[in-house]
Protein backbone atom coordinates (compact mmCIF):
# COMPACT_ATOMS: atom_id res chain seq x y z
CA UNK A 1 0.00 0.00 0.00
CA UNK A 2 1.01 3.64 -0.31
CA UNK A 3 0.49 6.58 2.01
CA UNK A 4 0.48 10.16 0.77
CA UNK A 5 1.66 13.08 2.85
CA UNK A 6 -0.40 16.21 3.13
CA UNK A 7 1.34 19.26 1.62
CA UNK A 8 4.14 17.07 0.21
CA UNK A 9 4.31 15.34 -3.16
CA UNK A 10 5.57 12.12 -1.61
CA UNK A 11 4.45 8.52 -1.66
CA UNK A 12 5.35 6.37 1.33
CA UNK A 13 5.38 2.64 0.66
CA UNK A 14 4.12 0.41 3.46
CA UNK A 15 3.26 -3.19 4.25
CA UNK A 16 0.39 -4.04 6.58
CA UNK A 17 -0.42 -7.33 8.27
CA UNK A 18 -3.68 -7.23 10.22
CA UNK A 19 -4.47 -9.65 13.01
CA UNK A 20 -7.92 -11.05 13.59
CA UNK A 21 -10.14 -9.26 16.08
CA UNK A 22 -9.43 -6.03 17.93
CA UNK A 23 -5.66 -6.29 18.20
CA UNK A 24 -3.20 -3.49 19.06
CA UNK A 25 -0.91 -2.23 16.30
CA UNK A 26 2.85 -1.65 16.10
CA UNK A 27 4.51 0.56 13.47
CA UNK A 28 8.07 -0.48 12.50
CA UNK A 29 10.68 1.99 11.18
CA UNK A 30 13.96 0.88 9.53
CA UNK A 31 17.43 2.42 9.69
CA UNK A 32 19.65 4.45 7.35
CA UNK A 33 20.12 2.99 3.87
CA UNK A 34 17.72 0.18 4.69
CA UNK A 35 14.04 -0.48 4.04
CA UNK A 36 11.00 -2.37 5.28
CA UNK A 37 12.23 -5.73 3.98
CA UNK A 38 15.37 -5.70 6.14
CA UNK A 39 15.73 -8.22 8.97
CA UNK A 40 16.11 -5.39 11.51
CA UNK A 41 12.39 -4.67 11.22
CA UNK A 42 11.08 -7.88 9.61
CA UNK A 43 12.28 -10.08 12.46
CA UNK A 44 10.76 -8.09 15.36
CA UNK A 45 7.59 -7.53 13.32
CA UNK A 46 7.26 -11.28 12.81
CA UNK A 47 7.73 -11.78 16.55
CA UNK A 48 4.83 -9.44 17.25
CA UNK A 49 2.61 -10.99 14.57
CA UNK A 50 3.04 -14.30 16.37
CA UNK A 51 1.91 -12.56 19.56
CA UNK A 52 -1.32 -11.48 17.86
CA UNK A 53 -0.50 -7.87 16.93
CA UNK A 54 -1.32 -6.05 13.71
CA UNK A 55 1.78 -4.45 12.19
CA UNK A 56 2.79 -1.82 9.65
CA UNK A 57 6.28 -1.57 8.16
CA UNK A 58 7.03 1.49 6.03
CA UNK A 59 9.86 2.85 3.93
CA UNK A 60 10.89 6.34 4.95
CA UNK A 61 11.35 8.88 2.16
CA UNK A 62 14.48 8.31 0.05
CA UNK A 63 14.43 4.62 1.04
CA UNK A 64 13.03 1.43 -0.41
CA UNK A 65 9.95 1.87 -2.60
CA UNK A 66 9.03 5.30 -1.23
CA UNK A 67 9.51 8.55 -3.15
CA UNK A 68 13.08 9.56 -3.95
CA UNK A 69 13.60 13.26 -4.54
CA UNK A 70 17.25 14.10 -3.87
CA UNK A 71 18.80 10.92 -2.39
CA UNK A 72 19.43 12.76 0.89
CA UNK A 73 18.32 12.04 4.43
CA UNK A 74 17.79 14.69 7.08
CA UNK A 75 18.62 12.74 10.25
CA UNK A 76 14.95 12.46 11.12
CA UNK A 77 14.09 16.15 10.75
CA UNK A 78 11.79 15.47 7.77
CA UNK A 79 11.46 11.70 8.09
CA UNK A 80 9.54 12.11 11.34
CA UNK A 81 6.55 13.14 9.19
CA UNK A 82 6.65 9.71 7.52
CA UNK A 83 6.41 8.09 10.95
CA UNK A 84 3.57 10.38 11.97
CA UNK A 85 1.74 9.68 8.73
CA UNK A 86 1.91 5.95 9.38
CA UNK A 87 0.80 6.38 12.97
CA UNK A 88 -2.13 8.61 11.98
CA UNK A 89 -3.23 6.17 9.29
CA UNK A 90 -3.50 3.46 11.93
CA UNK A 91 -5.24 5.78 14.38
CA UNK A 92 -7.57 7.63 12.02
CA UNK A 93 -8.18 5.27 9.09
CA UNK A 94 -8.30 2.05 11.08
CA UNK A 95 -9.89 3.64 14.14
CA UNK A 96 -7.36 2.22 16.60
CA UNK A 97 -7.18 4.06 19.96
CA UNK A 98 -3.87 5.86 20.53
CA UNK A 99 -3.18 3.79 23.64
CA UNK A 100 -3.26 0.63 21.49
CA UNK A 101 -0.59 1.75 19.01
CA UNK A 102 3.12 1.23 19.59
CA UNK A 103 6.06 2.40 17.47
CA UNK A 104 9.39 0.63 16.97
CA UNK A 105 12.51 2.16 15.41
CA UNK A 106 16.06 0.96 14.80
CA UNK A 107 19.19 3.14 14.40
CA UNK A 108 18.24 6.20 12.29
CA UNK A 109 14.67 4.93 12.59
CA UNK A 110 14.98 4.96 16.38
CA UNK A 111 16.12 8.58 16.38
CA UNK A 112 13.32 9.44 13.99
CA UNK A 113 10.76 7.67 16.17
CA UNK A 114 12.06 9.65 19.16
CA UNK A 115 11.51 12.90 17.24
CA UNK A 116 7.99 11.76 16.31
CA UNK A 117 7.41 10.83 19.97
CA UNK A 118 8.24 14.43 20.89
CA UNK A 119 6.04 15.83 18.11
CA UNK A 120 2.95 13.71 18.73
CA UNK A 121 1.99 13.49 22.43
CA UNK A 122 -0.56 10.77 21.70
CA UNK A 123 2.10 8.19 20.80
CA UNK A 124 1.69 5.92 23.78
CA UNK A 125 4.69 3.58 23.69
CA UNK A 126 7.92 3.41 21.68
CA UNK A 127 10.78 0.91 21.43
CA UNK A 128 14.13 2.44 20.42
CA UNK A 129 16.82 0.04 19.21
CA UNK A 130 20.29 1.63 19.05
CA UNK A 131 19.09 5.26 18.95
CA UNK A 132 21.30 8.28 18.47
CA UNK A 133 20.74 11.01 21.05
CA UNK A 134 22.36 13.88 19.16
CA UNK A 135 23.35 14.00 15.47
CA UNK A 136 26.24 16.40 16.10
CA UNK A 137 27.82 13.85 18.45
CA UNK A 138 27.42 11.16 15.79
CA UNK A 139 29.08 13.29 13.12
CA UNK A 140 31.93 14.26 15.44
CA UNK A 141 32.49 10.60 16.30
CA UNK A 142 32.47 9.53 12.63
CA UNK A 143 34.96 12.28 11.75
CA UNK A 144 37.34 11.23 14.51
CA UNK A 145 37.11 7.56 13.48
CA UNK A 146 37.99 8.60 9.93
CA UNK A 147 40.96 10.63 11.19
CA UNK A 148 39.48 14.10 10.71
CA UNK A 149 39.14 16.87 13.34
CA UNK A 150 35.77 16.95 15.08
CA UNK A 151 35.25 20.67 14.43
CA UNK A 152 34.42 19.80 10.82
CA UNK A 153 30.98 18.74 12.07
CA UNK A 154 29.90 22.31 11.40
CA UNK A 155 30.55 21.68 7.72
CA UNK A 156 28.03 18.83 7.73
CA UNK A 157 25.43 21.18 9.13
CA UNK A 158 26.22 23.73 6.43
CA UNK A 159 26.05 21.07 3.70
CA UNK A 160 22.64 19.97 4.92
CA UNK A 161 21.37 23.52 4.80
CA UNK A 162 22.91 24.07 1.36
CA UNK A 163 21.61 20.94 -0.36
CA UNK A 164 18.30 20.31 1.40
CA UNK A 165 17.51 23.53 3.25
CA UNK A 166 17.26 21.49 6.46
CA UNK A 167 19.35 21.83 9.61
CA UNK A 168 20.10 18.17 10.34
CA UNK A 169 21.09 19.15 13.87
CA UNK A 170 18.05 21.35 14.44
CA UNK A 171 16.18 18.92 16.67
CA UNK A 172 17.59 16.00 18.63
CA UNK A 173 16.04 12.68 19.70
CA UNK A 174 16.65 13.77 23.29
CA UNK A 175 13.48 15.84 22.86
CA UNK A 176 11.60 12.55 22.74
CA UNK A 177 13.13 11.44 26.03
CA UNK A 178 12.35 14.81 27.58
CA UNK A 179 8.72 14.64 26.48
CA UNK A 180 7.98 11.20 27.94
CA UNK A 181 5.59 12.38 30.67
CA UNK A 182 3.18 9.53 31.47
CA UNK A 183 4.12 7.55 28.37
CA UNK A 184 6.41 4.57 27.85
CA UNK A 185 9.87 4.04 26.35
CA UNK A 186 12.05 0.95 25.94
CA UNK A 187 15.65 1.67 24.97
CA UNK A 188 17.90 -1.18 23.82
CA UNK A 189 21.52 -0.46 22.93
CA UNK A 190 24.43 -2.84 22.43
CA UNK A 191 27.51 -2.30 24.57
CA UNK A 192 29.76 -3.08 21.60
CA UNK A 193 28.01 -0.80 19.10
CA UNK A 194 30.75 0.86 17.06
CA UNK A 195 28.39 2.83 14.78
CA UNK A 196 26.31 4.57 17.46
CA UNK A 197 28.21 4.21 20.75
CA UNK A 198 26.23 2.97 23.73
CA UNK A 199 26.50 6.32 25.54
CA UNK A 200 23.77 7.58 23.19
CA UNK A 201 21.35 4.99 24.54
CA UNK A 202 22.48 5.65 28.09
CA UNK A 203 21.92 9.39 27.66
CA UNK A 204 18.44 8.76 26.24
CA UNK A 205 17.68 6.51 29.20
CA UNK A 206 18.96 8.95 31.82
CA UNK A 207 17.05 11.82 30.25
CA UNK A 208 13.79 9.87 30.00
CA UNK A 209 14.05 8.79 33.63
CA UNK A 210 14.65 12.40 34.68
CA UNK A 211 11.51 13.64 32.87
CA UNK A 212 9.20 10.67 33.44
CA UNK A 213 6.00 11.30 35.40
CA UNK A 214 4.25 8.97 37.83
CA UNK A 215 2.35 6.86 35.31
CA UNK A 216 5.14 6.67 32.74
CA UNK A 217 7.81 4.00 32.42
CA UNK A 218 11.35 3.66 31.08
CA UNK A 219 13.12 0.36 30.49
CA UNK A 220 16.75 0.23 29.40
CA UNK A 221 18.72 -2.81 28.25
CA UNK A 222 22.37 -2.90 27.21
CA UNK A 223 23.17 -6.37 25.83
CA UNK A 224 26.60 -7.47 24.63
CA UNK A 225 27.34 -9.20 21.37
CA UNK A 226 28.64 -8.88 17.84
CA UNK A 227 28.03 -10.63 14.53
CA UNK A 228 30.35 -11.28 11.60
CA UNK A 229 29.47 -9.26 8.49
CA UNK A 230 32.44 -10.15 6.32
CA UNK A 231 35.52 -12.32 6.23
CA UNK A 232 37.32 -10.17 8.77
CA UNK A 233 34.73 -7.68 10.02
CA UNK A 234 32.32 -7.72 12.93
CA UNK A 235 29.66 -5.29 14.08
CA UNK A 236 27.81 -4.69 17.32
CA UNK A 237 25.35 -2.20 15.85
CA UNK A 238 21.69 -3.18 16.19
CA UNK A 239 22.44 -6.90 16.41
CA UNK A 240 20.96 -7.89 19.78
CA UNK A 241 17.80 -9.20 18.09
CA UNK A 242 20.16 -11.76 16.50
CA UNK A 243 22.54 -12.46 19.38
CA UNK A 244 19.83 -12.38 22.07
CA UNK A 245 16.90 -13.67 20.02
CA UNK A 246 14.88 -15.34 22.78
CA UNK A 247 15.41 -12.52 25.28
CA UNK A 248 14.59 -9.91 22.62
CA UNK A 249 11.33 -11.69 21.87
CA UNK A 250 10.54 -11.90 25.59
CA UNK A 251 11.33 -8.23 26.25
CA UNK A 252 9.18 -7.06 23.33
CA UNK A 253 6.31 -9.30 24.37
CA UNK A 254 6.44 -7.97 27.93
CA UNK A 255 6.88 -4.29 27.05
CA UNK A 256 4.18 -4.00 24.40
CA UNK A 257 1.91 -6.41 26.24
CA UNK A 258 2.02 -4.18 29.31
CA UNK A 259 1.92 -0.77 27.64
CA UNK A 260 -0.65 -1.63 24.95
CA UNK A 261 -2.70 -3.82 27.31
CA UNK A 262 -2.30 -6.97 25.22
CA UNK A 263 -1.65 -10.02 27.39
Describe each region flagged by the PLM.
Residues 180-181, 187-189, 193:
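Short beta-strand/loop motif that positions the catalytic acidic residue
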Residues 1-21:
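N-terminal cap/lid segment of alpha/beta-hydrolase-fold proteins
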Residues 194-200:
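Conserved alpha/beta-hydrolase "acid-adjacent" motif
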Amino acid sequence: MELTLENEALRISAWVREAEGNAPWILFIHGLGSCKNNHAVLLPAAMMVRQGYSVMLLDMREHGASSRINQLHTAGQEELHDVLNGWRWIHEKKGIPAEEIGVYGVSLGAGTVALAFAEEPRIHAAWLDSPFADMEKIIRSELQIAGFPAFLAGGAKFAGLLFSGIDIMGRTPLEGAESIGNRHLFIAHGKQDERIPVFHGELMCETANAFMLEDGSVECWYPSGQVTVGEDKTTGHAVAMLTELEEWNHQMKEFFGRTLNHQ
